[in-house]
Each structure stands twice: as C-alpha cells, then as structure tokens.
Amino acid sequence: MFYDDNADLSIIQRRKVGVIGYGSQGYAHSLSLRDSGVQVRVGLPEGSKSRPKAFEQGLDVDTPAEVAKWADVIMLLVPDTAQADVFENDIEPNLQPGDALFFGHGLNIHFELVKPSGDVTVAMVAPKGPGYLVRRQFVDGKGVPCLIAVNQDPTGTGEALALSYAKAIGGTRAGVIKTTFKDETETDLFGEQAVLCGGTEELVKAGFDVMVEAGYPPEMAYFEVLHELKLIVDLMYEGGIARMNYSVSDTAEFGGYLSGPRVIDADTKERMRGILRDIQDGSFVKKLVANVEGGNKQLEVLRKENAEHPIEVTGKKLRDLMSWVDRQSTETA
C-alpha cells in the first residue's frame, strides 16, 4: 500500500496532463489535478455537451487531438467502447516518445484493443469510487483508494508517475494498491457481470416474479426484493457481511443462513466460473466489440426487454410516492 509519503507530487506537476473525456471520472480528475498545481487541459469534441460545464469550472478545453498534441501525459477517460476510436484518430497521431498514456480501467490495453508504441509509458490510475465521491473527498482533504498499474515502462519511471498522479487526485491520502492491467480488468468485469449488475439484477427480478406468480401484490414484492435492498447493501458497505447480519433481526439472519445457500449453491458457483472463463479468454470482449460494430443493436434490444419487465412498471408507480428519491438520477425513461 502506498500513501502520501510514498509519492512525489512534483513529478506530475512538471508534466502537462490532458484528460480526454469529462464524465464522472473526467471532471473529478481534471479539477483535482488543477487544484494540485498540475497543468491540465480537457479534450472534448467541438459539439460535446460537456464543453460548457468544463469552461464554467475554469478549465482549458480543446479538441481531443489538440489536447493530445499539447500534453505529455494523456488520461483517457471516455467510455471503454469509444477508446479505440479516440486513440486511433486523436491520440496515436500525436504521441511522442517519452509521453505517457494513462487509463482509468484496463480493458482496452489488456485485450489489445488499444496498442500504443513501445516508447510510450502505459499506466493506470483507477479510483475505487465514482467521480463525485473522488472530487468530494479531495475537496474535504481526504481521498478515495486507488489502484495503479504499469503495463509499459520504457523509461523506468512509470510507477513513480502513476503514484504522483494518484496523489494529485487524493488517492494517496486514502491508500494506493499496486495491481496489473490483467487483474484489474478481469476482476472488474467479473464483479459487474456475476454480482453487482447482472447477478443482482436477475436475483431481484426472479424474486419479484416468484412472489407475484404466487399471488402476492406486485407492490409488496417490489418493496421486499428491490426497495429494501439498499438498506442491506448500505450495512454491508459500512461494515461487511457481519455488520449486516448483526443489524438485521434474528429472524432475518437465521432465515438467510438457511435459505441463502439454496439460492446460491455449488451449481451457481460453477456457472460463475464459466462467466470468469469467458472474461479471461476474451469471449466477452469479442461480443462487446461485435455489439459496438453492429451499432449497439444487441444492447438496445436487451435494454428494451429489461425496461419492459413488470418490476419496472411497478417501481415507477411506487417511486412517484417517494418524495425523497432523486427521480432525475433514477428514472431512465
């Protein structure tokens, strides 16, 4: 683990950093780098809706190509599916020997969708939290833990540069963990698919379906399997599974011990291993690339199917009754 004393902020302060993208992570990185005394410019296309926001926050903004030409450290923070095109069209033609190309996620490097030349440092600085939290913690004098990795290091200074960058966005205040592009990519994808997004979503929908099919009102089913999920996740987030079990009733704890393994059993774990194998051997990324090359048609079909599930209809109706819910961030249609 690395902390403030292990990182030299002056290293990144002597460089010119171009942040390509101004989404959740892009704005947090850009503003925190600037506030740490780093020269920073934001790369956004001419028609980007994020341009006014970046200008309003006092940042220098130019096209991705111009920023890549100016910078000697480029942090690529556009979505995974757009990175290869941005690299090919805007970044690669402007890379110089000795430049550094940074990523917030390892997918495109690990699966060789982006292939920088050997005279460019390739590294990753990945905060383990959303951009708003990275920025809020930085402003409060704290930080969000970060992962760093170096995939290509022609000058032998990649780790020091990555640590310096992490310090500039507050990461070393909380702690920085050294990893590899392979481990970060594969664990991140597996967590998303098997547990956080895919697994949880299907578990919730299945629970809803079982209750409704058994004759219970859909509103009751929604409250029990989706709405109350936040209460449980918050407890686990704050103190682990033990904290959650300590905080719920004895009835809930005892029932969970008995019934949980009936839902998630050895067969489930074997299917999860299959998901991990598909990630490790590149099968998933091939499907991802094929979807993008096909105009996202498969993704749009899946989104439509998901949006039409009865739990979404019920949920929208119930959330209309919840004045405390931020509807702007929760409603997608």
From Swiss-Prot:
InterPro entries: 6-PGluconate_DH-like_C_sf (IPR008927), KARI (IPR013023), KARI_C (IPR000506), KARI_N (IPR013116), KARI_prok (IPR014359), NAD(P)-bd_dom_sf (IPR036291). One of its GO terms (molecular function) is ketol-acid reductoisomerase activity. Keywords: Amino-acid biosynthesis, Branched-chain amino acid biosynthesis, Magnesium, Metal-binding, NADP, Oxidoreductase. GO terms for biological process: isoleucine biosynthetic process; L-valine biosynthetic process. Residues 1-179 form the KARI N-terminal Rossmann domain. The active site is at residue 105. It comes from Mycobacterium leprae (strain TN). Belongs to the ketol-acid reductoisomerase family. The gene is ilvC. Mg(2+) 2 binds at residues 188, 224, 228. One of its GO terms (cellular component) is cytosol. This is Ketol-acid reductoisomerase (NADP(+)). It catalyses: (2R)-2,3-dihydroxy-3-methylbutanoate + NADP(+) = (2S)-2-acetolactate + NADPH + H(+); (2R,3R)-2,3-dihydroxy-3-methylpentanoate + NADP(+) = (S)-2-ethyl-2-hydroxy-3-oxobutanoate + NADPH + H(+). Mg(2+) 1 binds at residues 188, 192. Residues 180-325 form the KARI C-terminal knotted domain. Binds 2 magnesium ions per subunit.
